[in-house]
Amino acid sequence: MPKFLDAVAGFGVTFGSMFKKPVTEEYPEKPGPVAKRYHGRHQLNRYADGLEKCIGCELCAWACPADAIFVEGADNTEAERYSPGERYGRVYQINYLRCIGCGLCIEACPTRALTMTNDYEMADDNRADLIYGKDKLLAPLEPGMGAPPHAMAPGATDEDYYRGTVSPSAEADAR
């Protein structure tokens, strides 16, 4: 085969793609669908009565290979109860400049407090705004949830909370 045909064969791929319909994504105006199991931004979850699931054990921070999570636990008191256990996460921060989205923190969490949402639009022009604190990570209160701190549900134990058998707060229903 003559050498000049090698160049023509190489252009065959180019000519073949010239007549295909272009695939254009109009991203900011029309975001495309996101897979249900997509791992995006983290979320700290709550129990049905509004108490936080995070117990401040720091296992997520230890599991993080990028050292992107900082947790500082504190003790619950009867006057100020944020989670059903002895402790809660007083300070919780995720540095999205370091996070690699691996999900090891999710696997390490013993109370299923930390999950990943489908939210992927976290870009910012200020580096400090990409360190998410507990205020940005906590799941919003849904109807029937009381804002912590408040007492555990009457007659409920830590095990009831862990098994998910606690119903929405009676305090929130009264509001």
Swiss-Prot record:
Free-text comment on the cofactor: Binds 2 [4Fe-4S] clusters per subunit.
Cofactor: [4Fe-4S] cluster
Annotated binding of [4Fe-4S] cluster 2, by residue: C64, C99, C102, C105
EC number(s) per entry: 7.1.1.-
Stored Pfam families: Fer4_7
Binding site for [4Fe-4S] cluster 1: C54, C57, C60, C109
Statement: the UniProt record of this protein carries the keyword Mitochondrion: no
Family from the record: Belongs to the complex I 23 kDa subunit family.
Protein name: NADH-quinone oxidoreductase subunit I
